Amino acid sequence: MAENRGGHGPGARGGYQKPKDAKRTMLRLMKYISGRKWLLVIVFLCVIASSIASIAGTYLIRPVLNELVGAGTLSDKLGYLAKMLAVMAAVFLFGAVCTYAQSAIMAQLAHRGTNKLRGELFDKMQDLPLSFYDKHPHGELMSRFSNDADYVQQMLEQSIVSVISSSLLFVGIVVVMLFTCAPLFLVTLLVLFGSFFAIRIVGGRSRKLYRQQQKALGEMNGNIQEMIEGLRVVKAFTHEDAAKAQFGELNDAYFDVAKDANFYGTAMMPIVANVMNIGYALTSIVGGLFAFGGMLDLGGLAVYLQYGRQISQPMSQVSQQMTSILSALAGAERIFEIIDMEPEVDEGVVTLVGAHKDANGAITEDRESVHPHTWAWKVPRSSRLTLVPVAIEPDGSPIELGQAVREGGALRMLAPNVDSPDGIWVRAERDGSLTEVKDLAALASHGWAWKYPDSAGESTLHIVRGSVRNVPGEDYCLTELKGAVRLIDVCFSYVPEKPILKHVSVYANPGQKIAFVGSTGAGKTTITNLINRFYEIDSGMITYDGIDVRDIRKDDLRRSLGAVLQDTHLFTGTVMDNIRYGRLNATDEECIAAAKSANAHSFIRRLPDGYNTVVSGDGANLSQGQRQLLAIARAAVADPPVMVLDEATSSIDTRTERHIERGMDALMEGRTVFVIAHRLSTVRNSNCIVVIEHGEIQEKGDHEDLLKQKGRYYKLYTGQNILD
């Protein structure tokens, strides 16, 4: 079901969620527009000037009326009137210019500030772990960029200035009214209390109904989205009538609450206007009596009545804008909640670098090639890893070699990378003793391994495959990237005390194909997510070419891995752009070569504009099979040594399936491959098939071995059980 978007989805603006710390959030938001403080000073001066101009322009009516009704010739009165009209026009024009200036400047500052805010939000979301997205619906996250950011922009652009301007105008009008006739202001004060009471009662009911309207609209929009996305299923099960009935109920519920909300919303202004009209009449009567009694001149009465009509406007504007401000501050808090989150932790120090390998197998770092053919792990000597020479036993286990010196008849092993002319080569046996090695060349097999300390003070050795550069004096060493991946007693849980994987151990040598088979939810995809370090394991170890993946920088680790997922996601852009997404610096020729190897070139050529055909939202104008072929081409252009292939469960025609299988075969050639299998026919040629259920490995072996065991795999293969 679609998530309920009632809280943040598109809807009426009348309801709002109160911010938790309005003052702190407002001060933080102001930093986004305070980069050019002199512009804020100009805005503030313009607000003051426009408020004064509005008050002064109205007050000029008083001397004009008093002059017109006083003694003097008609020509003198007309001359004075013309002069004062020119002054009034200049005052109001000045106020209009100041209002325009403040609006234009605040619009620029608000757009700039919101742009920066959205940028920080997007950047932070790129740095958050996948576990964050597991806990937050996509619609909720999208509302941060749309609704919440829009509310913040409107507040910065209009609401704050409007509240300041209205407050200044209100205070200015009150001061002038008191100056004009203080006793008459008591009547005005009574009217203001009446207006405030009406706004509070009607406005409170209106806000409550608008919140209900927003929730009802969110539920209705969620239903519409769900029905559009699942229209094929609705039609397949002939549930059109049920869908219509369900939407009708939601639509009617929205209509009922919207009707009441609009009634109270539209009733606000007439009620306040009637209260003010009654007050205006009462003020006119009392003011007239004051004028007849000589307490107030005619011009003063006219000005006072005009201010009496104007005083309700700033009150109403402040009330309306405070709702917008509180909505914006609540939205800003939701944005800052994400911005303040801790980014994905990465304590890795090992980096992936291009390398050059000479005829003798020696490697050096290649800093010139854009896309080198050989890659290596660059390991700082300051890390916890230590590269040591080893002898490899017949069972494949490593035994540390090193140089030692005799001290008092006993051997003491020197630190790794310490070359002593008097040193004696020895083996560090498992019982801790040292055995002298007379002739290194006589060892059946020897090489290098990474030495890892463990929590018990012991150490473990992980064999390095491929060439090694270990030059004393250099602050780093290089080991060739080969694609050997090992999961060693791995345990993992998304939620504490609810294990997903239990003591899983899987070994993949370079170039091997490892297939995971099991029911939905068994933990197959979780294993591949752990190899990518999308999540961190609870215990155990995952090594890549003998290096703990936790010691490899995540960006470098993921650059060395490729993935073709069952839910193929394509981005808006051309076919060429989507292939190049695998490696952004790939040339057109490299992208076309990747498409050919993925068996996608033939269908791409038949598209209206070939490789320049624009892919619509998530590849809706392509078939499922075509999207998969593009995903394979995208992985091929990245050319990683290790691949993760999650087979699609969608039904595709036999011909397209053969195209995809050939593309997959070409992509897997010469790489270490992890396959999440949904069709057993595709895993028969795997070096190892791992049957996993409930997070535990039940069986492990090649196709023939597992058939002989006649266990879970045998039942799946012979059709006695269903895979998914």
Give the positions of each predicted feature.
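Helix-loop-helix
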Residues: A71-G72, K77, V176-L190, D260-E333, ...
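Transmembrane helices of ABC transporter permease
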Residues: G35, L39-A49, F94, Q158-Q212, ...
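Alpha-helical segments in transporter systems
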Residues: N4, L27-M30, W38-P63, M84, ...
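ABC-type nucleotide-binding domain
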Residues: E347-G348, A355-D724
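Transmembrane helix-loop-helix hairpins at lipid-water interfaces of multipass membrane proteins
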Residues: L40-C98, L178-P183, G294-L298
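Cytoplasmic coupling helices
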Residues: A2, A104-D123, P137, I164-S165, ...
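An intracellular "coupling" helix at the cytosolic face of ABC transporter transmembrane type-1 domains
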Residues: L130-S131, N147-L156, I160, I164, ...
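Juxtamembrane helix-loop junctions of ABC transporter transmembrane domains
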Residues: G14-A22, L45-C46, A53-V69, V91-H138, ...
